[in-house]
Amino acid sequence: MSSNKASFFTRLRRLCRLTVWLFKTGKNLRGIDGGCPESRNRAVIELGRGVLAALDIGLEVGRPAPEHPNGVLVAANHVSWLDIFAMSAVYPSSFIAKQEIKSWPVLGKMGQNAGTVFINRNSRRDIEPINRAVCETLQRGQNVSFFPEARTSSGLGLLPFKAALFQSAIDAGAKVLAVALRYYDETGKRTARPSYADVGLPTCLWRIVSMKKLTIKVDFVCVADAAESEDRYALKDKIEESIRAVVADDADIAV
């Protein structure tokens, strides 16, 4: 067995704990359905931490979230399905996610109850109603997170950001928070193994549970005022450049 892999027993233990977590969560999904924002935020934080704990995944916050009011559009780079749980564990919000996730067992229902907006990434007709829905959510004081790359990458760099959904922040007069996500192995080097870019969910999950140690680092990079941007393209460029600088910082030591 390769020295950088978890034992078979450890892999099975992690999968069993995740299964138990899914079962328990599936019975208590109403905890994030309705209610006051504070109670739902607490439930979302617990969900995020629960998944990471079940899989023995460490979580570090490099640059902490700045003080700001609610109703923030959060933009992050996209590496893995774990991104949502890592972000939820430290900064609860609703998400904009691909339509396929809605049909996933338990996770799809969790997303619906947490206010996730599901989109068809191949349909431009979805953009206007989604921007309107996100704008209304932001104006109600609820945070919304999304991944402007629109698909997962290796995590060692960025794919070009899409500008369309930044319009919702401009329409709502909201702040935009840039978040950089990086994944590290047991040696402290960057790793692309948790990436969901070129494999299905079962293979991705097996890669994750097979790692001796996995740590996700979350950096809250900067806050931009959408009202001060010339248009959604200028806003997109500012957020993309700030995230790219952090993601590229130590990518040269990746394994």
From Swiss-Prot:
A motif (HXXXXD motif) lies at residues 78-83. It is found in: Cell inner membrane. Pfam families: Acyltransferase. InterPro entries: AGP_acyltrans (IPR004552), Plipid/glycerol_acylTrfase (IPR002123). It is an enzyme of class 2 (transferase). Keywords: Acyltransferase, Cell inner membrane, Cell membrane, Lipid biosynthesis, Lipid metabolism, Membrane, Phospholipid biosynthesis, Phospholipid metabolism, Transferase. GO terms for cellular component: plasma membrane. It catalyses: a 1-acyl-sn-glycero-3-phosphate + an acyl-CoA = a 1,2-diacyl-sn-glycero-3-phosphate + CoA. GO terms for molecular function: 1-acylglycerol-3-phosphate O-acyltransferase activity. The keyword Acyltransferase applies. Pathway: Phospholipid metabolism; CDP-diacylglycerol biosynthesis; CDP-diacylglycerol from sn-glycerol 3-phosphate: step 2/3. It is a peripheral membrane protein. SUPFAM superfamilies: Glycerol-3-phosphate (1)-acyltransferase. GO terms for biological process: CDP-diacylglycerol biosynthetic process; phosphatidic acid biosynthetic process. It comes from the Bacteria. The keyword S-adenosyl-L-methionine does not apply. Its EC number is 2.3.1.51. The HXXXXD motif is essential for acyltransferase activity and may constitute the binding site for the phosphate moiety of the glycerol-3-phosphate. Converts lysophosphatidic acid (LPA) into phosphatidic acid by incorporating acyl moiety at the 2 position. Belongs to the 1-acyl-sn-glycerol-3-phosphate acyltransferase family. This is 1-acyl-sn-glycerol-3-phosphate acyltransferase. It comes from Neisseria meningitidis serogroup A / serotype 4A (strain DSM 15465 / Z2491).
